[in-house]
Amino acid sequence: MAEDAHTEDLSTQTPQQEGLPERLRVHSLARVLGTTSRRVLDALAEFDGRQRSAHSTVDKADAERVRAALTESPAAETPPEEAPAAETPVADLVVVQAEQVEVVTVSEAGPAEPAEPAEPEAPAAEAEAEAETEVADEAETPEPTFRGAVLVGDEPESRLILEHANIPPARETQTERPDYLPLFVAPQPVSFEPAVVDDEDEDDDTETGAESDFDSGADSDSDDDQADRPRRRRRGRRGRGRGRGEQNDDATSDADTDSTEDQTDGDEQESGEDSDDSGDEDSTTTEGGTRRRRRRRRRKSGSGDSDDAVSPDDPPNTVVHERAPRTERSDKSDDSEIQGISGSTRLEAKRQRRRDGRDAGRRRPPILSEAEFLARREAVERTMIVRDKVRTEPPHEGARYTQIAVLEDGVVVEHFVTSAASASLVGNIYLGIVQNVLPSMEAAFVDIGRGRNGVLYAGEVNWEAAGLGGQNRKIEQALKPGDYVVVQVSKDPVGHKGARLTTQVSLAGRYLVYVPGASSTGISRKLPDTERQRLKEILREVVPSDAGVIIRTASEGVKEEDIRSDVERLQKRWSEIEAKAAEVTEKKAGAAVALYEEPDVLVKVIRDLFNEDFSSLIVSGDEAWNTINSYVEAVAPDLMPRLTKYEPAGPDAPDVFAVHRIDEQLAKAMDRKVWLPSGGTLVIDRTEAMTVVDVNTGKFTGSGGNLEQTVTRNNLEAAEEIVRQLRLRDIGGIVVIDFIDMVLESNRDLVLRRLTEALARDRTRHQVSEVTSLGLVQLTRKRLGTGLVEAFSTACTHCGGRGIVLHGDPIDSASSNGGRKSDSSGGGGSGGGRRGKRGKKGAARTEEVHVAKVPDHTPGEHPMFKAMAAANGKHEGDEDHEDHEDHETAEDTTAAEVRDDTRDEHDADERAHVVTAAVGAAGDEDLDDSDEDSDLDSDEESDDESDEDEIELDDDEDELDEDIEVIGDSDDSDDSDDSDEDDDSDDSDDDSDEDEDSDSDEDEEPVREVYEPPVTAPRARVRRRAAARPAGPPSHD
């Protein structure tokens, strides 16, 4: 439309110019004429009676008429005493406007200069108030309300008037509206101090774009008109300083124009009465846009404003905190450089972990009440079984070792093995020799006489003993190469990592742990509150001042004399260790010495684990019985009734592990894949960095409900089994668990809570971390000793433990899979279900040339060929003498009609006869048995590769998990959707295929009776035609 056309708002045309534009808007015409939009609208209404708005478009003729009418009107209405002002032409006023624009343009580049006062025009403004009030009362033409400020030379005109005019002091508010008001006289003059125009004003106004210029220009006269009314405060201007006025004008120009285009004159009067409130509201809603513009200006300039500088966008008394740029903050180094910390990195890491734990809301486990403590103890029946066994493999053939198994409700949850080869070093105390100190690693390597050096980190150094309690704690200041240092092994060597050492020595007893040099005591939170209070009173009298203790759970109900004797025994042992270390240090023998070694694993497990929680302790073997019996009688005679010695019924009777089915459970624990009772699976992989557990549904398809319920049940079952596997395999370090994705947050919390409750039975130190963004559960666990797999396995000498075979040439995975399946199907017909049948089909086609022992059927006996011969006018007996190519021509004419119906039947017949001949030559094996064997083989392959019915929802529903190997498989992709039930039903009929139905199976029976041929040598050309599957008589192989 014409009114939507964008016109130049910043027009500087004056009446001195020869002509007006062909088309222009009302507000632009009012600006050119130096009057208000209301007067222009009134003049236009007098001409034709039409109702217009400030955005209406007028042509040149109407504009000339309005200019003529408005030029004559002021001269006629001006009083005689104001004749000098009336004689002043309007053109002069416009010239002054143009000059004023030039002054503003210059002032933007430099400091603002006060303009000439506009006092001569003030009386004219007072005189015109009465006339314009009368016109405003009579006029009822609708006119939308326009807010904002017109931009002349990138500045609002109203701002130019206030900033560049020496305005007289404020006077009483006028009660009458002036009839005519020149553009450059402030309707409500206020005292104002000129402010320095910042360079950011240009950016602020420029960023608003052409639309902001258009809207603000259209609203200038409307603002002037509203400002003439009594008690009207100009939004963002009066009494609020330049800063807030600029903010309101700039921020509201875009929003107000769009929201007020369709309002009427009555709306304008209502908005005029509420202008104060609306102005404040608009400034609040658009404050975010102003802040964004400030940020853009900072990014353009490259640096922010100083704290002392006042931003023009902020109101007075506003405290602005601006973040200093990174370039100013990092004076010493650049962002690309690596930053360091003062002091020990490992000590800082400890402090950071504590802070992160507090920030994350992690709390210590709650102290149990006595009822909860007894309920937890009685909830599970625990049994400990010990077996002595003789080695049967070199190099220590004939040696004895001891196995210890802990059962909870008949299920093995922990396993320990003790032997000379797998002896644990944890707890041993050595007088080591420092080999080298690495300040950059904050670690020292110490020779402890075990072949491989142990590592001592800065976080494990006893700084008080080293004399660096209050100084800068650096490991190079505490240790030097060649120094003797008393260290204790805190972690066994694993893989290529040496033993972990610490100088904070602790001695474990039956009821407590003695810590020399410590000053604090600790009590296990697994004890009830009443027992903790009793033990605290005992420790105040028992513990010496130069040591600390940690109470174990085994001290529950123990008398004060037993605890005192335990403390005195451990204190005496520490005195002996110190004396021996001082003696060796004085001699300077130059070799590491073992100061104290922990007892045998058997004694350690009995000391640490066997308490009132166990209902019985069953021991098999004389040597183990003597050791356990003597130790328990010495330290815990109240537990003697729970000891039982196992005596086999005869020499061939099963041992104690076989009776409790422990060997069977240990054998399953050696596997990589663990089957859940419901059919789900766990895949446990151990790497150098962490242990990863993957949860799969396996053959678990649910027992009702939707997919979310099925997945949650599988995850709940997996959470308990994962904790059991961690304890049984003694997996330590970082453990990451990939549960199947659940949609509901409540189900995720339920699984995590079940995992935490199961870990409460684990006596080792563990911590469940947060769930990652990918849905992985992280936890850490302290290793007790040698793991189950590590104790009974060694790395493969061929592949180095990687489990792969390397070749010199690249291996084609497709050909290798196809060869494996064809070999297995040829040997025993492996591959259950449809996969097995397709494999057998391929094998039959490959071996058809070698097995060809079945003679070709006489074509004339087939009913279809009889009909073909009759149609061609030939005799049945003449068909044998015809050339083979004539047969192919006749067959091709009918192949398109019957090939789709008989293709599967012929294929099934061929496979049946070929397999029959092959089996007869091999020994007349049963086809059903071969199918069952192939089904078993396929199940074994699916364990290693994929399950056809396995549901995997781990990372994304649209992505294929590695457990569903559809891509790259030798079979068709649609077989992956087949279930085991379908495979079992298909195995009962070896001739069925996924495209066949019961009707096709019924049709196969009479065909087999018709095609029983005598065993003769087949023709080679017919064999080639049968391989190509023509629509003709099938070849009976």
Curated annotation (Swiss-Prot):
- Entry's cofactor comment: Binds 1 Mg(2+) ion per subunit. Binds 2 Zn(2+) ions per homotetramer. Zinc ions are bound between subunits.
Top-level taxon in the UniProt lineage: Bacteria
Compositional bias of kind Basic and acidic residues: 47-67, 320-335, 844-864, 897-913
Positions bound to Mg(2+): D694, D738
Fetch the InterPro entries from UniProt: NA-bd_OB-fold, RNA-bd_AU-1/RNase_E/G, RNase_E/G, S1_domain
Residues annotated as coiled-coil are 561-589
Per the entry, which co-factors are needed? Mg(2+); Zn(2+)
Feature: compositional bias, Basic residues: 230-242, 291-301, 834-843
What residues does Zn(2+) bind to?
A: C796, C799
Instruction: Provide the residue span(s) of the region labelled Disordered.
Output: 1-23, 47-90, 106-369, 810-1037
Give start-end positions of Acidic residues composition bias. Answer: 127-141, 196-226, 248-284, 879-891, 923-1006
> Do you know which SMART domains this protein is assigned to?
S1
Instruction: Give the matching CDD domains.
Output: S1_RNase_E
Provide one Gene Ontology biological process annotation.
Answer: mRNA processing
Q: Which SUPFAM superfamilies match?
A: Nucleic acid-binding proteins (SSF50249)
Q: List residues of the S1 motif domain.
A: 427-504
Q: Which reaction does it catalyse?
A: Endonucleolytic cleavage of single-stranded RNA in A- and U-rich regions
Q: What happens when the gene is disrupted?
A: Essential, it cannot be deleted. Depletion experiments show decreased processing of furA-katG operon mRNA, altered processing of pre-16S rRNA, minor effects on pre-23S rRNA processing. A double rnj-rne depletion mutant has decreased amounts of mature 5S rRNA. Depletion experiments show a decrease in growth rate and decreased expression levels of many transcripts, and suggests rne and hupB are coregulated.
Spell out the Low complexity composition-biased ranges: 68-90, 106-126
What function is annotated for this protein?
Endoribonuclease that plays a central role in RNA processing and decay. Plays a major role in pre-16S rRNA maturation, probably generating the mature 5'-end, and a minor role in pre-5S and pre-23S rRNA maturation. Probably also processes tRNA. RNase E and HupB jointly contribute to cellular adaptation to changing growth conditions and survival during antibiotic treatment. Overexpression or depletion leads to changes in gene expression; overexpression induces metabolic slowdown and cell stress while depleted strains grow less well than induced strains.
Name by which UniProt lists this protein? Ribonuclease E
Task: Please name the source species.
Answer: Mycolicibacterium smegmatis (strain ATCC 700084 / mc(2)155)
What's the encoding gene here? Answer: rne
